[in-house]
Amino acid sequence: AELGTEPNAKTSSSSSSVSSTATSSSSSSASSPBRKKPMD
């Protein structure tokens, strides 16, 4: 049971971390082209 819980918690944490990074990257990427377009 312990072994099953450890990997389970790690997967959840990893998923959350990846989701956060993906969202941040997406926001930055979208802002970059959006700002360059009007600037151009």
Curated annotation (Swiss-Prot):
Domain of life (superkingdom): Eukaryota
Keywords: Phosphoprotein, Storage protein
Residues annotated as transmembrane: none
Disulfide bond among keywords: no
PTM section of the record: Phosvitin, an egg yolk storage protein, is one of the most highly phosphorylated (10%) proteins in nature.
Molecular function terms, GO-annotated: nutrient reservoir activity
Annotated function: Phosvitin is believed to be of importance in sequestering calcium, iron and other cations for the developing embryo.
Protein name: Phosvitin
